[in-house]
Amino acid sequence: MLRWALIFFIIAIIAAVFGFGGIATAAAGIAKVLFYLFLVVAVVMLVSALLAGRNLTR
């Protein structure tokens, strides 16, 4: 159990370094772009599946 506590402590330290170091701002920008990109892809796939008349869940 102590091993897991140390692992999560190290992960928390690494996350703090990234969060307070300014890298989080760049990552958030990239995440927003990817979110909207995949949202558009999902909508296009949904519309194309509906127009083709196929079952959405294979």
Swiss-Prot record:
Belongs to the UPF0391 family. InterPro entries: DUF1328 (IPR009760). This is UPF0391 membrane protein GM21_0108. It is found in: Cell membrane. It comes from Geobacter sp. (strain M21). Its main location: membrane. It is a multi-pass membrane protein. Keywords: Cell membrane, Membrane, Transmembrane, Transmembrane helix. One of its GO terms (cellular component) is plasma membrane. The chain crosses the membrane at residues 4-24, 33-53. The lineage of its organism: Bacteria, Pseudomonadati, Thermodesulfobacteriota, Desulfuromonadia, Geobacterales.
